[in-house]
Curated annotation (Swiss-Prot):
Compositionally biased region (Acidic residues): 281-292
Name of the protein: CD276 antigen
Signal peptide limits: 1-28
Domain spans labelled Ig-like V-type: 29-139
S-S pairs: 165-220
Pfam annotation, one family: C2-set_3
Organism lineage string: Eukaryota, Metazoa, Chordata, Craniata, Vertebrata
Extracellular face of the membrane: 29-248
Glycosylation, residue list: 104, 189, 215
Source organism: Rattus norvegicus (Rat)
Regions of this protein lying in the Cytoplasmic compartment: 270-316
Residue span of region Disordered: 281-316
Gene3D superfamilies named in the record: Immunoglobulins
């Protein structure tokens, strides 16, 4: 039948063999798997459940069981008269041998990786053939967000501040939400980036830019869409009123006193200059008045002598 599948002696491809098998068998064997995706955390073990209903007198020698990736047809695990594994899953897959005879064809996948995510098909052949596919979703919870503030000191109302929310080692990509202190969503001035590391896990950095008020609380929520888990982080910022330290206050007082003294000195100098100028003008005016009176006194005798001469002439 399907003996030897997955081994080096296979002469035809698995897809061709399964196609021939589908044509030859009636499909009376019924394979059942979970309709809901199987969710597994990174680095934990996952069980992909698959079952069939064995007929009375069933023997494992009649069973051919194959697990493979649905899309690529890559072999994951097989059971014919033993097991054969694909290299990508070496030492990481196992069946439940003691339960096979009861119709339990489930696959145990150990130490789940991000790259294990996908659809897996369970093929069961006894005398008839059937198959079914089950989905595996891989997830990893995000760490509690760390909040950083830039600038982080000497903040005043009206300052533009940058708040960064960082969460690490999650999968799949996160959904990030910002809220203010009243629980209202903040969607403007938000920039979010997500980068996968070598294991495929994401580091999230979301940046919010806001104008600081008198005080405010800002919350960051990082949601894992598969696990429906939320990681919260928040920061409360208080904008301090403008104050001066004691040193600055003394410097300000000293400068003010110096400025007052300088203005007083300047006013005194100006007053002295103005006073001196006024005194000089007054002195000049007095000198001019004195010169005028002297001239008048000198002229008076001359007039008197002239009168005498005139008188003399008349007498003569």
């Amino acid at each position: 039948m399907l003996r030897g599948w997955g081994g080096p002696s296979v002469g035809v491809s698995m897809g061709t063999a399964l196609g021939v098998l589908c044509l030859c068998l009636t499909g009376a064997v019924e394979v059942q798997v979970s309709e809901d995706p199987v969710v597994a955390l990174v680095d934990t073990d996952a069980t992909l459940r698959c079952s069939f209903s064995p007929e009375p007198g069933f023997s494992l020698r009649q069973l051919n069981l194959i697990w493979q990736l649905t899309d690529t047809k890559q072999l994951v695990h097989s059971f014919t008269e033993g097991r054969d594994q694909g290299s990508a899953y070496a030492n990481r897959t196992a069946l439940f041998p003691d339960l096979l005879v009861q119709g339990n064809a489930s696959l145990r996948l150990q130490r789940v990786r991000v790259t294990d995510e996908g659809s897996y098909t369970c093929f069961v052949s006894i005398q008839d053939f059937d198959s079914a596919a089950v989905s595996l979703q891989v997830a990893a919870p995000y760490s509690k967000p760390s909040m950083t503030l830039e600038p982080n000191k000497d903040l005043r109302p009206g300052d533009m501040v940058t708040i960064t929310c960082s969460s690490y080692q999650g999968y799949p990509e996160a959904e990030v939400f910002w809220k203010d202190g009243q629980g209202l969503p903040l969607t403007g001035n938000v920039t979010t980036s997500q980068m996968a590391n070598e294991r495929g896990l994401f580091d999230v950095h979301s940046v919010l830019r806001v104008v600081l008020g008198a005080n405010g609380t800002y919350s960051c929520l990082v949601r894992n869409p598969v696990l429906q888990q939320d990681a919260h982080g928040s920061v409360t910022i208080t904008g301090q009123p403008m104050t001066f330290p004691p040193e600055a206050l003394w410097v300000t007082v000293g400068l003010s006193v110096c400025l007052v003294i300088l203005l007083v000195a300047l006013a005194f100098v100006c007053w002295r200059k103005i006073k001196q100028s006024c005194e000089e003008e007054n002195a000049g005016a007095e000198d001019q008045d004195g010169d005028g009176e002297g001239s008048k006194t000198a002229l008076r005798p001359l007039k008197h002598s002239e009168n005498k001469e005139d008188d003399g002439q008349e007498i003569a």
